Regions:
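A short, flexible loop at the N-terminus of ABC-type nucleotide-binding domains that lies
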Residues: 4-8, 17-30
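Short beta-strand immediately N-terminal to the Walker A/P-loop
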Residues: 41-42, 94
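The feature captures the beta-strand-to-loop junction immediately N-terminal to the Walker
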Residues: 44-46
Length: 137
């Protein structure tokens, strides 16, 4: 029996450059990253090292200058905005550095809220929220 976990996110040779006036600024050069199901990954580095840019690319919010992005083995590198939006909605989640819970809501209600905004019915959202809270503690 094969116990190897499935790769859920893979970045291959990701490069990202920006223009500052007439200068080209290379922010990421040849980054490879593979994340398997159930893994927890931390990106650490000094300010300006490209962490946020890499996360924006991995989250399909930013397009790399070159390289490939695979989500559940599907090459997402050349997808249009509509399909990228659907993949973000269905498979990705973000917790931003400066996040705030809604103080008048319970933990369960705070977890339910993005699902309800996405159109998930309340029963399903509550069930999934409880599962997530139990899993994450």
């Amino acid at each position: 029996m094969n116990n190897e976990k499935e790769t859920v996110l893979e970045l291959k040779q990701i490069c990202k450059s920006f223009r500052q006036g007439s200068q080209k600024l290379d922010v990421l050069t040849g980054v490879d990253l593979e994340i398997k199901s159930g893994e927890i990954v931390a990106l650490i580095g000094p300010s300006g090292s490209g962490k946020s840019t890499l996360l924006q690319i991995a989250g399909l919010l930013e397009t790399p200058s070159s390289g490939e992005i695979y989500l559940n083995r599907q090459n997402c590198s050349k997808l249009g905005d509509g399909l990228r939006t659907l993949l973000r909605r269905d498979f990705l989640g973000f917790v931003y550095q400066y996040h705030n819970l809604l103080p008048d809501f319970s933990a369960e209600e705070n977890v339910m809220l993005p699902q309800l905004i996405a159109g998930v019915n309340a029963g399903t959202a509550r069930e999934k929220s409880r599962w997530l809270l139990e899993r994450l503690g």
